[in-house]
Amino acid sequence: MIDRDGFRANVGLILCNQDDRVLWARRAREKAWQFPQGGVKESETTEEAAYRELEEEVGLGVEHVKIIGCTRSWLRYRLPNRYVRYGNKPLCIGQKQIWYLFRFVGEEQDVQLNLTDKPEFDYWCWVNYWYPLREIVYFKRKVYQRALNELAPLIFPDHQSLPPARSNYRKRRRQKTRSRI
């Protein structure tokens, strides 16, 4: 669904384990990392879309997760011009997202990335709640910051884990050896 302003309705999914670490997944074709996300169909609510996308992208059903909360309103980002398909009608210039925070209550082996013919992701790991802000592609960074900051009090009631508000996180190089992040 693309609205009259050119934004595609979408859900973003933050899956948090019992240690308050979040599922971070590597896209199969681009080798970029991100949270699972996906479009909202005309016939479904954002909550229904969130559950459907969880199952399609990481193989988790309602028995594996519990909704903790979601953002109060749509969070928008514009696509860089090189990603806009100007020949498509209606024209999509970006995404508007409702973000859901889920508690993972399943087992590690329940995460299945290969349930579709074209999997979205080829690898996943648990990372610190704030880690994605340093690693996400630049044009999604502000939306990630807003979603993580809005949802953080639901799992960090004392707010001690909130980072200082900064709109421009510096890009960091990936280390060649991977340690627990």
Curated annotation (Swiss-Prot):
Which cofactors, if any, are listed as required? a divalent metal cation
The Nudix hydrolase domain, residue ranges: 6-149
Q: Does the keyword Cell membrane apply?
A: no
Please state what class of enzyme this protein is. hydrolase
Q: Where is this motif: Nudix box?
A: 38-59
Q: Which keywords are on file for this protein?
A: Hydrolase
The disulfide bridges present are none
Q: What is its EC number?
A: 3.6.1.-
**Family annotation (InterPro entries):** Nudix_hydrolase, NUDIX_hydrolase-like_dom_sf, NUDIX_hydrolase_CS, NUDIX_hydrolase_dom, RppH
Q: Which domain of life is it from?
A: Bacteria
Q: Which NCBIfam families match?
A: PRK00714.1-4, PRK00714.1-5
**What PANTHER family does the annotation carry?**
ADP-RIBOSE PYROPHOSPHATASE, DIHYDRONEOPTERIN TRIPHOSPHATE DIPHOSPHATASE
| Name of the protein in its database record | RNA pyrophosphohydrolase
**Organism, scientific name:** Nitrosococcus oceani (strain ATCC 19707 / BCRC 17464 / JCM 30415 / NCIMB 11848 / C-107)
